Amino acid sequence: MKNTIVQQQRFLQSIHKPTYLQRPGSFALVYPYYAVMAGLGLYSLYASGRVIFGKKDAF
């Protein structure tokens, strides 16, 4: 079995991106997560505004 640690280290250090975006295909996991978190944050602000103005239901 060949040791490929040095080649992997060279690959990862040559890319100037954050660690969580360096691997191929990682954007398929990271960006949907960002979208869900942004949507939940916006919904939370919307529902908080509704409660502040006296409307108990979010819809």
UniProtKB/Swiss-Prot annotation:
One of its GO terms (biological process) is proton transmembrane transport. InterPro entries: COX7a. It is a single-pass membrane protein. It is found in: Mitochondrion inner membrane. Keywords: Membrane, Mitochondrion, Mitochondrion inner membrane, Oxidoreductase, Transmembrane, Transmembrane helix. The chain crosses the membrane at residues 25-47. Pfam families: COX7a. Pathway: Energy metabolism; oxidative phosphorylation. Its main location: mitochondrion. GO terms for molecular function: oxidoreductase activity. Disulfide bonds: none annotated. Residues 48-59 are mitochondrial intermembrane. GO terms for cellular component: mitochondrial inner membrane; respiratory chain complex IV. It comes from the Eukaryota. The keyword Membrane applies. The keyword Oxidoreductase applies. Residues 1-24 are mitochondrial matrix. Component of the cytochrome c oxidase, the last enzyme in the mitochondrial electron transport chain which drives oxidative phosphorylation. The respiratory chain contains 3 multisubunit complexes succinate dehydrogenase (complex II, CII), ubiquinol-cytochrome c oxidoreductase (cytochrome b-c1 complex, complex III, CIII) and cytochrome c oxidase (complex IV, CIV), that cooperate to transfer electrons derived from NADH and succinate to molecular oxygen, creating an electrochemical gradient over the inner membrane that drives transmembrane transport and the ATP synthase. Component of the cytochrome c oxidase (complex IV, CIV), a multisubunit enzyme composed of a catalytic core of 3 subunits and several supernumerary subunits. The complex exists as a monomer or a dimer and forms supercomplexes (SCs) in the inner mitochondrial membrane with ubiquinol-cytochrome c oxidoreductase (cytochrome b-c1 complex, complex III, CIII). Belongs to the cytochrome c oxidase subunit 7 family. This is Cytochrome c oxidase subunit 7. It comes from Schizosaccharomyces pombe (strain 972 / ATCC 24843). The gene is cox7.
